[in-house]
A protein has these predicted regions:
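Alpha-helical metal-binding/catalytic segments enriched in His/Glu/Asp
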Residues: 181, 231-233, 246-264
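Short amphipathic alpha-helical segment within the helicase RecA-like ATPase core
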Residues: 1-237
């Protein structure tokens, strides 16, 4: 998916133009106001959507009204969630080219809009022989381009972490995660079993006894000149967790590989 920053989204010949609506207010689209609000009494509650054709009156084919709820209650996180829902709806309609017209929002929505858009685009289909072709390919929005590009990098990192978490446990082994960690260009130290024993990491090693895979304790360090403070982030990296003494039920089998998500 490619996000393009433009000045006039209504001039884009999109498959769908997404317009936001606050409760008790109208949209920028006269067609949406006439049919969604006046005829069908669409309220614009948070997360609700209303799709209608433009009947050839506009360059874009359809309008998707996206409810944002009460204006006073809209937060950046809620905007990200709403954007996610809008993209998913556009994917259901097999739209390839989507434009967003976000009006009346009282904060810079560039980052959260980008995050919601790209998170909605995520799917792990690496091992599927048949892949669905219902993705939105182009998204147009009027936003801060610098913030959009930065948010794209954050979303790419999230995608990378999700891909690691979704890999089968026989492939995403402790040794494989250690190899990946060493490729990031950070100061990285991988501690083996013997080194962990010397540090008294009994609980960590007790978990490792349940696997034929060798344990790897990964320590990554990012340094800058004259740091104001030190921050330690600890992420659980159990690559397959069946529950230990309390074995998880069969219904939890699909998520046993997810226990390394924080480390990813």
């Amino acid at each position: 998916m490619e996000i393009k920053v433009v000045q006039d989204v209504k001039a884009i010949d999109a498959d769908i133009l997404v317009v936001n609506m606050f409760e008790g207010e109208k949209t920028i689209s006269e067609i949406a106001n006439k049919y969604a609000i006046e005829q069908d009494n669409f309220k614009g509650k948070f997360g609700e959507t209303y799709l209608l054709p433009t009947y050839g009156q506009e360059v874009y084919k359809k309008v998707l009204v996206l409810g944002l709820g009460k204006k006073s209650e809209l937060t950046p996180n809620k905007l990200r969630e709403a954007t996610y829902k809008a993209i998913k709806k556009c994917m259901q309609m097999e739209a390839k080219k989507v434009a967003f017209s976000l009006e009346g929002i009282e904060f810079d929505y560039s980052e959260q809009f980008t995050m919601g858009t790209l998170i909605a685009d995520y799917v792990f289909d690496k091992y599927k022989s048949e892949k669905k072709d219902n993705k939105v390919r182009e998204v147009y929005v009027q936003a801060n381009e610098g913030i959009v590009r930065k948010a794209e990098k954050i979303a790419a990192a999230m995608t990378f972490a999700r891909n690691l978490a979704n890999e089968p446990a026989q492939l995403a082994t402790p040794s494989e995660l250690a190899n990946i960690a060493c490729d990031f260009g950070l100061e990285t130290k991988i501690y083996n079993r013997e080194e962990c024993e010397k540090m008294g990491m009994g609980a960590f090693l007790a978990v490792a006894k349940g696997s034929a895979q060798e344990p790897k304790f990964i320590h990554m360090k990012y340094s800058v000149e004259n740091p104001k403070k030190r921050i330690a982030i600890i992420g659980k990296g159990i690559t397959f967790d069946s529950g230990g003494l309390d074995i998880k039920p069969a219904s939890s089998m699909l998520t046993m590989k997810d226990d390394m998500s924080a480390a990813a």
